[in-house]
């Protein structure tokens, strides 16, 4: 079976502004939003901590767009799974412009992440633009007790089981 390629983008970040909700002539919702992802590192020469933030344009369609418009706000942390798409248009001066966006459509995922004390909601759409999975994840922050195990008590079997 020949592969035609894979176009999948996974991002976790924070919204830079409230989602912008619009409706197409057929009544389907479309949301445009910007998502910031950051990476941190230590400069080898100065020892100084550095940070680089990358901004991503995200476009959601259908029910995911409606949910994002209702529940997400500037600063919300969100997990996005979609595909990368570049489109071209002409600006007011007739110049060709390009933009690259992460499209979250059929088969895409948006998961609203929260702080440590909030719950998380996961929403995925199938081919018919129907929500196929919504789950609430309870976050338990209680500390776990770790018991020390004496390595002399562990019975290592020298034989490989296959």
From Swiss-Prot:
Q: Which Gene3D superfamilies match?
A: Nucleic acid-binding proteins
Q: Does the keyword Transit peptide apply?
A: no
What residue stretches are annotated with the SSB domain? 6-111
Q: SUPFAM superfamilies recorded for this chain?
A: Nucleic acid-binding proteins
> What biological processes does GO assign it?
DNA recombination; DNA repair; DNA replication
Which Pfam families did the record assign? SSB
Task: Please verify whether the record's keywords include NAD.
Answer: no
Keywords for this protein: DNA damage, DNA recombination, DNA repair, DNA replication, DNA-binding
Residue positions of motif Important for interaction with partner proteins: 157-162
- One function term, GO molecular function aspect: single-stranded DNA binding
Which stretches are labeled DNA-binding? 55-61
- One Gene Ontology CC term in the entry: nucleoid
Cysteine pairs forming cystine bridges in this chain are none
Q: How does it assemble?
A: Homotetramer.
Q: What does this protein do?
A: Plays an important role in DNA replication, recombination and repair. Binds to ssDNA and to an array of partner proteins to recruit them to their sites of action during DNA metabolism.
Could you identify this protein by its name? Single-stranded DNA-binding protein
Q: Which gene encodes it?
A: ssb
């Amino acid at each position: 079976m020949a592969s035609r390629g894979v176009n999948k983008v996974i991002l976790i970040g924070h919204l830079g502004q409230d989602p912008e909700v619009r409706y197409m002539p057929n009544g389907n919702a479309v949301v445009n939003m910007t998502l910031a992802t950051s990476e941190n590192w230590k400069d080898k020469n100065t020892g100084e901590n550095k940070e680089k933030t990358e901004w991503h344009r995200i476009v959601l369609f259908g029910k995911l767009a409606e949910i994002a418009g209702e529940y997400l706000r500037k600063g919300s942390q969100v997990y996005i799974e979609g595909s990368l798409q570049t489109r071209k248009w002409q600006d007011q001066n007739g110049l060709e412009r390009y933009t690259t966006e992460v499209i979250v459509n059929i088969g895409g995922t948006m998961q609203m992440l929260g702080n440590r004390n909030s719950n998380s909601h996961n929403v995925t759409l199938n081919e018919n633009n129907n929500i196929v999975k919504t789950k609430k994840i309870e976050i338990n922050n209680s500390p776990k007790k770790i018991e020390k195990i004496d390595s002399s008590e562990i019975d290592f079997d020298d034989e490989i089981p296959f």
